[in-house]
Amino acid sequence: IDATKVGIYGHSGGGFMSAAAICTYPDFYSAAVSSAGNHDNRIYNKGFVEIHYGVDEKVTTTKDSLGVESKTYDYSVRVRPNQELAKNYKHGLLLFTGAIDQTVNPANTLRLVDVLIKADKDFDMFVLPKCTHGFFGESESFFEHKMWRHFARLLLHDNSADCDIDLNKDMIKDERRR
């Protein structure tokens, strides 16, 4: 294993984590692919976030002119959005989002993209027009092709011809022999 060439991939919560990883440890990770990531859990599914990440409660007590107390409750998500980590990011991030994703709204990715652009960071991004949270058919093939090319370029320094990786080709050959 070459510890100087480490890549990470994740989808959905894993997409959040792969982007967080390359932003948190930019000298360790050489490449990351993040698809459909919930990069900003302040706008993601509140029930999921509260159960899996937790919520902090801040109570502020004030008194009015008559001495009557009132309390104000403020809640915040414990896990930081990737936008806050983006300042550490150096290189190697490829982002994907489905244009009609109703599970993780594309705004999660666009908020991260906005911060990366403002910080003049180099990254790549694709919006898959016909995709919801999962990528299927032509979009899935396109996604896989771009992901493998990204890893080949950054981890293997291979900028040669198209990368044609069919993970099932051996299985397909075996089925044809039967």
Predicted feature locations:
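Active-site-proximal cap/loop segments of hydrolase catalytic domains
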Residues: I1-R178
